[in-house]
Regions:
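A short glycine-rich, Lys/Arg-flanked "PGG" loop and its adjoining helix->strand segment in the class I
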Residues: 137-149
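Short alpha-helix
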Residues: 191-208, 214
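Conserved class I S-adenosyl-L-methionine
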Residues: 1-52, 65, 69, 154-179
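A short acidic, Gly/Pro-enriched loop at the edge of an enzyme's catalytic core
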Residues: 111-121
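A short SAM/SAH-binding and catalytic strip from SAM-dependent methyltransferases
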Residues: 120-134
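Class I SAM-dependent methyltransferase SAM/SAH-binding core
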Residues: 65-109
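A C-terminal cap/extension of S-adenosyl-L-methionine-dependent methyltransferases
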Residues: 213, 217-266
Length: 266
């Protein structure tokens, strides 16, 4: 499978499925100091709200990085994932001790879960892929439906605006030949879907989500990966303190490859 073949797949679910024949989600969040910034940040915000005995649903669970982390802290996890490659990687790591109920399915249809059955819901993968606004809203509404009243939903987006600088770091000609609208600076939504901070915020407001935090979840960590990965443990710890110092500043939120929104179901 390559990008040209992927682009020819018309069915969105199948296209998303095959995307992970190309991209290795299993190692994305853990292969280096720079890569772990997003994971560390996301866990930090989840743990602000997680209580003993909470039930967690991980929608678009990938290869299970978050599911395993919280299952091994004693939480009961339900995980739903679409892509065959991710399901296979997830299953290889499952042990009898892991309290994880893994289901292969689509984030647009959570009918296997009852209304108001989870205290915490993760929506970290689906909004990287859904292009149609109606599908985005349906996905969010399904996450809301299965979340208890007052429960917390964690949303991840890929930031449209900062990706330019990250790609420029790989390709000095990106601004002349990159795959984006040269007038509006909107990236082409392939193979992933990109949102500005404002677009992500409006999407959640439209679903009546009470936004508690807007976070630059990895900041410039990919752009600065070489330097970050060279850091001593002491320097890395201080870098993370700096990252947490700036990651919710309004002027810095969009300066990140990934965005984390923490919402409360009203």
């Amino acid at each position: 499978m390559d990008f040209e073949q992927l682009a020819k797949i018309e069915n969105e679910s199948e296209r998303v499925n095959r995307t992970y024949d190309i991209f290795n989600e299993e190692s994305r969040l853990n292969h280096s100091k720079a890569a772990r910034v997003e994971f560390i940040t996301t866990v930090h915000y989840i743990e602000k709200y997680l209580k003993e005995g909470d039930k967690i649903l991980d929608i678009g669970a990938g290869a299970g990085e978050y599911s395993f982390y919280f299952a091994r802290k004693g939480y009961e996890i339900s995980a739903l994932e679409l892509a065959d490659a991710n399901i296979e990687a997830f299953k290889k790591k499952l042990t009898p001790e892991d309290k994880i109920n893994l289901v292969q399915g689509n984030a647009l249809d959570l009918s296997c879960y009852e209304d108001k059955s989870f205290d915490i819901v993760f929506l970290f993968g689906p909004l990287y892929h859904l292009k149609n606004n109606e599908d985005k809203q349906k996905c969010i509404e399904e996450a809301k439906r299965v979340c208890k009243d007052g429960g917390k939903i964690f949303f991840a987006f890929i930031s449209n605006d900062f990706v330019f600088l990250t790609e420029f770091g790989y390709d000095s000609n990106y601004f002349s030949n990159g795959d984006y609208d040269k007038d509006t600076f909107k990236l082409n939504d392939f193979p992933f879907v990109f949102h500005t901070v404002e677009a992500a915020r409006n999407l959640l407001h439209k679903s009546d989500i009470n936004i508690l935090h807007e976070v630059a979840s990895d900041g410039a960590s990919e752009l600065l990966a070489m330097r970050i990965n060279e850091m001593s443990e002491e320097d890395y710890a201080q870098y993370l303190r700096y990252h947490f110092y700036i990651c919710e500043k309004p002027e810095m939120i969009g300066m990140s490859n990934h965005l984390l929104f923490v919402g409360k179901k009203r």
